[in-house]
Amino acid sequence: MAATLRELRGRIRSAGSIKKITKAQELIATSRIARAQARLESARPYADQITQMLTTLAADAALDHPLLVEHPQPKRAGVLVVSSDRGLCGAYNANVFRRSEELFSLLRDEGKQPVLYVVGRKALAYYTFRNWYIAQSWTGFSEQPKYENAAEIASTLVDAFMLGAGEGEDLQTNNEQSVDELHIVFTEFKSMLSQSTEARRMAPMVVEYVEETGPRTLYSFEPDATTLFESFLPRYLTTRVYAAMLESAASELASRQRAMKSATDNADDLIKALTLMANRERQAQITQEISEIVGGANALADAR
């Protein structure tokens, strides 16, 4: 009985220690989520403006840029998987990996070989453990991505896409560094309680038109619209990668906040249940000790 009581008290102490950790993680995630949301909201006007500019240029430019042209026989599809660097965020990474596997299956059914690029230590560890070939990985900034990080990633992806563009089917098929399509898997932030894992194609690109609220403005371009259009396309792709990373960062923090709150609540419930069991055990122990004392006293009285 004494051993059982010691075990219960040990479990209560362990649950209390875990509760301190989960509560701290919950508070940290709560403090960071507001900044992540602010960064996401502040980046949207820029994304809308560059999309609007690209739309305006597309009205006058000849749309024959390699980033807009479908490959006649696509064989390799680059997939950028955006995960987290740290755990303790519920099913956030599991949902990303599940959506990625669905995309890989779809690409294989279409006769395309997936070429993997990953963001975040969790994706790197997940696919390394499963012996996947990873073309390139980026880690260390999943919670606070910078535009420079997105620019580096987008540059790598564009280089892989452009490597075989226009060079002939044999070169593009045989070159292990080239891809014919680009896709991204990330988590879209909708609210603190709602996030969805998305898989979207980035290249060949389809320009997303932003509807103008007022009269359409006519522009005079210097240099010509086609040159500007070609200059803006890589920047547009960088913006899409950056936006996806900001969405994922906010989603990661929201998932961690919810997961840690749930863990803290569960620890509270466990501590209450164990405390009740310990109290009952202690009461039973005291009752037994009293019974033994009374029994001993009665035995002495009878002996006299």
Swiss-Prot record:
InterPro entries: ATP_synth_F1_ATPase_gsu, ATP_synth_F1_gsu, ATP_synth_F1_gsu_CS. Keywords: ATP synthesis, Cell membrane, CF(1), Hydrogen ion transport, Ion transport, Membrane, Transport. Pfam families: ATP-synt (PF00231). It is a peripheral membrane protein. GO terms for molecular function: ATP binding; proton-transporting ATP synthase activity, rotational mechanism. The keyword Iron-sulfur does not apply. One of its GO terms (biological process) is proton motive force-driven plasma membrane ATP synthesis. The keyword Disulfide bond does not apply. It comes from the Bacteria. NCBIfam families: ATPsyn_F1gamma (TIGR01146), PRK05621.1-2 (NF004145). F-type ATPases have 2 components, CF(1) - the catalytic core - and CF(0) - the membrane proton channel. CF(1) has five subunits: alpha(3), beta(3), gamma(1), delta(1), epsilon(1). CF(0) has three main subunits: a, b and c. Belongs to the ATPase gamma chain family. This is ATP synthase gamma chain.
